[in-house]
Curated annotation (Swiss-Prot):
It is an enzyme of class 3 (hydrolase). PANTHER family: BIFUNCTIONAL DTTP/UTP PYROPHOSPHATASE/METHYLTRANSFERASE PROTEIN-RELATED, BIFUNCTIONAL DTTP_UTP PYROPHOSPHATASE_METHYLTRANSFERASE PROTEIN-RELATED. Nucleoside triphosphate pyrophosphatase. May have a dual role in cell division arrest and in preventing the incorporation of modified nucleotides into cellular nucleic acids. This is Nucleoside triphosphate pyrophosphatase. Pfam families: Maf (PF02545). It catalyses: a ribonucleoside 5'-triphosphate + H2O = a ribonucleoside 5'-phosphate + diphosphate + H(+); a 2'-deoxyribonucleoside 5'-triphosphate + H2O = a 2'-deoxyribonucleoside 5'-phosphate + diphosphate + H(+). The keyword Cytoplasm applies. The active site is at 69 (proton acceptor). It comes from Helicobacter pylori (strain HPAG1). It is found in: Cytoplasm.
Amino acid sequence: MELILGSQSSARANLLKEHGIKFEQKALYFDEESLKTTDPREFVYLACKGKLEKAKELLANNCVIVVADSVVSVGNRMQRKAKNKQEALEFLKRQNGNEIEVLTCSALISPVLEWLDLSVFRARLKAFDPSEIEKYLESGLWQESTGCVRLEDFHKPYIKSSSKNLSVGLGLNVESLLGVLKLGAKLSSL
C-alpha cells in the first residue's frame, strides 16, 4: 500500500528515508493561523488533527497517509516558524542556555487504522556563541524550522543533555510510526 507523507518538511522526509520507508511527499494545506490557542501542546495537537482531516480527503486512493506538526516550547512559551530575522533572534535568545522542548504530534490514517501521537523531545542547551548566531541568521536555514531549532546542525553542538527520542525533535515520531506501520500491515492481511 502506498504511503504518502503529507508534509513539505525535508527533515521528516529524511527521517523516513533513513528508516528505509518508501513514500511519496505531498503538501496538505491546513491554515494554522486559524488556531487561536497559545498553549504549545494544544496548538500542535489541533494543527495535526487539522492536517489529518485534510488527509482523509485523499483516502479514497486506498493509501496510508502520515502527517505531523511540531512547535518549540521554552518556559511554556510557544515558538513556531519565525516570520523574520528579528523574531528568529528573539527565539534564539530565549533558547540560549535554557531547556527547550520540541513538541511533535504525528498521525497516520489508512483504510484500517488511525493513529495519533503527541511526544516531547527535551534538550538542555549551553550558551550559544554570538558569532555563530549571526552566521546562522545570515544562512537563512532558520526559516525552514519551527522555533528556528535545527538539532541536526546549528543546535547540535550546544546540546548539554537531551531525551533519547531525537526523531521527535526532528519532527516525526519514527520509532512509534514503525510499530504502527507493522500493525497496519497485519490488520490489512486479515
